[in-house]
Amino acid sequence: MSFNTSMLIADIVGITGSFSTAYGAHTGIATLPLKYYGNEDQKKKFLTGLVSGELKGAYCLTEPNSGSDANSGKSKAILNSDKSKYIINGQKMWISNGGFADIYIVFAKIDDDKNLTAFIVEKSRDGITMNPEEDKLGIKGSSTRQIFFNDVEIPIENMLGEREGGFKIALNVLNIGRIKLGAGVLGGCRGIIDNAISYSLERIQFNVPISSFGAIKQKLAMMIVQTFSCESICYRAGDDIEKKISFFQKEGKSLNQSELEAIELFSVECAISKIY
């Protein structure tokens, strides 16, 4: 699947709100760390199930005191005495898909490391507990929960990527998530415009549809112009990324490496697509 095809899917499902949140968290930030950084054994054990939908994934980065400053997280991973397992302790919050996920991508620091390391943690492991679902203003059909890791033991084979490489994994995956969130919002905007136009045609005041009033026309026009601007930003950035992926592949780099380097190159555009 090309990058822009995945952008189009995010756009189409964006109107669904709750489903698009669950879908995006699973196929994006929960699955891509394994796609890009997992070894062959990890991909066979976990990625196959995530891709088929047999397993559901969640991404555990944010903590009560580390949001945008993600690398300041306090979650810890310590080797046990025979160095066969990591023991993870910590708290994660606002975890999309947290309630029903089977696999968690968890970020923690080993001993006194300065940077995070990524780990694959199965929900079935002992020591995992969670708070009730968050009482959100919207997207109530998606799961958002706090997750606690209390002496959770995982085999050393479940470390994802290199030691202290977790922060890099987190940022690269979030860059992809940002631009796809922008594409997802497009779908929501189009749905809102459709509903607004339909209502303006149905609502009658002074014996005419309110769509004939100048103020309503102006509001609808601004909605359309702003949505078109957002669309232009997202798909221009997506096309630039797609072209760079192709360029890097022609240089002999793998698809995964090409995608990562292209996303890194356009990380600012990814952030703009999300914020705008």
Protein language model annotation of sequence segments:
Residues 1-15, 37-38, 42, 53, ...:
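Alpha-helical interface subdomain recognition
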Residues 9-14, 108-110, 121-126, 150-154:
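Short Ser/Thr-interspersed hydrophobic loop/turn segments at strand-loop and sheet-helix junctions
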